[in-house]
Amino acid sequence: MVSQEQIEAIGGVLNNKDRPLKERFRALFTLKNIGGKTAIDAISKAFDDDSALLKHELAYCLGQMQDPTALEILTKVLKDTTQEPMVRHEAAEAMGAIGHADVLAILEEYKKDPVVEVAETCAIALDRVRWLQSGQQVADNNPYASVDPSPPTAGDKSVAELKAIYLDAKQTLFDRYRAMFSLRNLCTEESVLAIAEGLKDSSALFRHEVAFVLGQLQEPCSIPYLQENLEDHKENEMVRHECAEALGAIATDDCIQILTRYADDEKRVVKESCVIALDMCEYENSPEFQYADGLSKLDGTK
């Protein structure tokens, strides 16, 4: 059992702007794993930080925790137009992940947001909440401990059939996401390469989710695709950030070399993502028991 004092101490690390960002990230993921109101309160306090990357990750973690207690702060962040688009987008996605009917009205309102990534995210989150409310069941062979923005496509479809839906810009983003998560769950080289083709899509939101999924898969065959988008300085920084973190999850020597080159990128979000990704590479290539090591850091153990 984790004590209140321990949770507050980990929250102190997260909210200490003098600590290295990689330490604050590990503290955040420790709080996510612990859960509960005290952890949510500690995470919520950090939304006044000046790092868009950190705030985006705060919202992501609150969504993954699926605790309706977080809806108040997530709604506030979505409404706050002074927050960076990637932060507001992640708040909307987190509201969809929590899946409570109370969010329908606010998501409907912000589906018309002038920021495209925010509007598209609200539309997908709305579809997810409505899908949950419909009571439909689908076999979800998700091998990852993630709450996805959509369920996989219903029924057994081939890679070719799923790829056709996935790359069809006429389909709704929700249905294209469903096909993507089905391709991910197949986890073959053919399905991974099909997913990688999505990095050429016209929607920055879609490309960023593609990169996230490739990071979950951790398949080296996707490295050249992720590298190309990371190295493109005209690419949306939200996409470049997600490509960097995906390379950090794959964690080969090639990934480390690519990330090291961009660890001083002129875009702060990209630079910080490469630093966090290099820390993830270090973890992936070490005997460390877990990445979210805030508790062991508190008592001095490894």
From Swiss-Prot:
Q: What is its EC number?
A: 1.14.99.29
Q: Where in the cell is it found?
A: Endoplasmic reticulum membrane
| Keyword Repeat found | yes
Q: Which SUPFAM superfamilies match?
A: ARM repeat (SSF48371)
Record's keyword terms, sorted: Endoplasmic reticulum, Hypusine biosynthesis, Iron, Membrane, Metal-binding, Monooxygenase, Oxidoreductase, Repeat
Give one GO molecular function term: metal ion binding
Q: Give the protein's function.
A: Catalyzes the hydroxylation of the N(6)-(4-aminobutyl)-L-lysine intermediate to form hypusine, an essential post-translational modification only found in mature eIF-5A factor. Essential for organismal viability and plays a role in a wide number of important processes such as cell growth and proliferation, and regulates induction of autophagy and protein synthesis. Has a role in eIF-5A-mediated translational control.
Family per UniProt?
A: Belongs to the deoxyhypusine hydroxylase family.
Q: What is this protein called?
A: Deoxyhypusine hydroxylase
What organism, scientifically named, is this protein from? Answer: Drosophila pseudoobscura pseudoobscura
Gene behind this protein = nero
